[in-house]
């Protein structure tokens, strides 16, 4: 099991849409990563510099490849992923 610290700049005008998709459960049911992505984004924190930060569980190489293609690259820019040991 691998955990990653994710930092990314949210696209401000799309945050409401992302919140709606999270609240509707649409993201949670995405296979195979939906539960982990939902949990990570629900618990993300917005730092004073405008960067969102959260922890994500993932098994892919490269990390978060499926999540990026389906969700993250639509709603965030400058995504940085660091493995947590």
What are the functions of these language-model segments?
Residues 1-52, 57-69:
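Short S/T/G/P-rich N-terminal loop/turn motif that feeds into the first structured element of a domain
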Residues 77-85:
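Conserved short beta-strand edge segments in small beta-sheet-based binding/regulatory domains
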């Amino acid at each position: 099991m691998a955990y990653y610290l994710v930092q990314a700049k949210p696209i401000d005008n799309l945050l409401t849409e992302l919140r709606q998709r999270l609240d509707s459960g649409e993201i949670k049911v995405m296979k195979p990563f939906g539960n982990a992505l939902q949990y990570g984004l629900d618990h993300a924190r917005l730092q004073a510099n405008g960067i969102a930060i959260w922890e994500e569980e993932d098994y892919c190489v490269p990390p978060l490849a499926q999540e990026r293609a389906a969700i993250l690259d639509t709603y965030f820019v400058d995504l940085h992923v660091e493995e947590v040991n």
